[in-house]
């Protein structure tokens, strides 16, 4: 037996030590942090599946990725992303997490806040957290989930109507992380009595710079940037004005992430809306589709109608931008309420997932497989036990929505980080009308199929409270 010599202490220069610490910090920062609040890894989440699935020869995906690379490397141009869905999107936590991550990655490219809607101007209607809305006067709410909406609807799928009295809707920006001041406001809406809205800020009412009656746009070019303002609707007895959306822009290049969501909305509900004019205003480069949880809520889920209704929306978008890229988000795992405190797993989740892959194949889009990533069938119960999903086993908590937003962002970042080919591959252009043999035997039925009512989730149309 022998004694080991005592090693001499190694003295590391301070500069080298700092460099090593910096390197270690960089390596640590590249580790996925699914929940920005807790940084916790969950054993039931399939992190290895967190990616976008698409054909690398897709023209729309190639062009979007090239445009993203060009804008983010040169600082010139704009990228417009629309995120469409139901209550998962209206609540705002999920899309805002994706938006926050994208803009934080490119702080010099803060584009306009984009399309918003004053949801809480109406009673019992929830608003995203990054802006507050107040309206003292009573307004009538119209949503695309209604069987026959009384008032016209646009891309937002929701409207508020002022009637008989002057109405003031206050929009207060509460986002402190980004400069969302705007110099360009577009009020979307119409009045059969010729009511013209105004914008009020710093104690004065400003009329529109110009009015486009064909597209129902009232455009305001402001002399100074504002982050909060009032929408003034000067109605008198017997007069109405229906507000269908508000678009906030600026003159800076950058990224705009528009979230469009209506509680309880299914795919056919958006077919009740006039989409084209508002789409021409935004001209999206990418649309993230998160509609489907309400379509698949009932036992009699019609996958053919689900696919064809989705294709009808895709056709409308492609009529505005023929090479708009699509990401189809598969439904989250969910349960169906069967009685008091009793739930049964919703087996339609895998069926909706298959349709999303079919849609991506037809349109040249991508799939973000939320269903697979979160753990597959019956995984929602595990999310609930961890405080990530609500008791209804359909909606997430705030922590859950933030986690989902982080995961989607990370999947997108993986694509952004890939080197672009020196020469663009021969693209597979998305066909405006897929061949008959691609559609199976459905013969492209685009009749609007309402979501099931008798067997649907009773909570799907309710205002989803999202606890911390």
Regions found by a protein language model. Give the residues of each.
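Bacterial Sec-dependent N-terminal signal peptides
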Residues: 1-39, 456-468
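Terminal targeting/pro-maturation regions of precursor/exported proteins
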Residues: 31, 75-77, 88
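Membrane/wall-proximal cationic-aromatic binding patches
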Residues: 38-83
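Conserved, compact domain cores that house catalytic/ligand-binding motifs in diverse enzymes
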Residues: 58, 77-83, 90, 94, ...
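A generic secondary-structure signal
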Residues: 67-70, 101, 173-174, 277-278, ...
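Active-site neighborhood of phospho(di)ester-bond hydrolases with catalytic His/Asp-centered motifs
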Residues: 83-85, 110, 117, 329
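Catalytic His-Asp segment of secreted/periplasmic serine-dependent ester chemistry enzymes
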Residues: 263, 272, 333-449, 461-467
């Amino acid at each position: 037996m022998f004694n080991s010599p005592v090693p001499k202490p190694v003295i590391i220069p301070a500069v080298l030590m700092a460099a090593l610490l910096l390197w270690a910090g960089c390596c640590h920062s590249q580790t996925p942090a699914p929940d920005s609040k807790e940084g916790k890894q969950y054993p039931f989440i399939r992190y290895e599946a967190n990616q976008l699935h698409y054909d690398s020869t897709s023209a729309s995906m190639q062009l979007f990725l090239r445009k993203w690379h060009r804008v983010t490397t040169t600082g010139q141009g704009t990228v417009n992303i629309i995120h469409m869905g139901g209550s998962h999107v209206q609540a705002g936590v999920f899309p805002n997490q994706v938006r926050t991550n994208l803009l934080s990655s490119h702080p010099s490219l803060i584009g306009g806040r984009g399309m918003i809607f004053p949801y809480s101007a109406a009673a019992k209607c929830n608003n995203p957290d990054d802006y507050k809305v107040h309206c003292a006067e009573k307004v009538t709410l119209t949503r695309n989930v209604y069987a026959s909406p009384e008032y016209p609807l646009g891309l937002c799928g929701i409207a508020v109507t002022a009637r008989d009295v002057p109405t003031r809707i206050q929009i207060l920006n509460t986002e402190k992380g980004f400069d969302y001041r705007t110099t360009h406001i577009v009020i979307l809406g119409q009045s059969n009595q010729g009511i013209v809205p105004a914008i009020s800020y710093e104690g004065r009412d400003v009329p529109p710079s110009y009015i486009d009656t064909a597209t129902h746009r009232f455009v305001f070019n402001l002399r100074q940037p504002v982050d909060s303002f009032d929408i003034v609707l000067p109605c008198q007895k017997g007069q109405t004005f229906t507000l269908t959306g508000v678009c906030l822009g600026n003159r800076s290049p950058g990224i705009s992430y528009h979230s469009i969501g209506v509680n309880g909305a299914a795919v056919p509900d958006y077919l009740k809306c006039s989409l084209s004019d508002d789409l021409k205003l935004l001209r999206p480069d990418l649309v993230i589709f998160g509609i489907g949880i309400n379509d698949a809520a009932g036992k009699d889920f019609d996958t053919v109608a689900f696919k064809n209704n989705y294709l009808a929306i895709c056709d409308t978008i492609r009529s505005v931008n023929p090479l708009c890229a699509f990401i189809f988000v598969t439904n989250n795992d969910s349960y169906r309420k069967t009685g008091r405190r009793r739930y049964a797993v919703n087996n339609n989740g895998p069926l909706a997932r298959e349709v999303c892959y079919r849609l991506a194949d037809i349109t040249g889009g991508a799939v973000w497989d939320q269903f697979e990533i979160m753990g597959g069938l019956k995984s929602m119960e595990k999310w609930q036990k961890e405080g990530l999903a609500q008791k209804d086993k359909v909606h997430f908590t705030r922590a859950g929505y933030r986690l989902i937003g982080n995961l989607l962002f990370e999947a997108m970042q993986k694509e952004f980080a890939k080197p672009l080919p020196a020469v663009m591959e021969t693209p597979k252009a998305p066909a405006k009308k897929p061949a008959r043999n691609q559609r199976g035997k459905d013969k492209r039925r685009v009749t609007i199929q309402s979501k099931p009512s008798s067997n649907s989730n009773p909570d799907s149309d309710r205002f989803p409270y999202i606890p911390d």
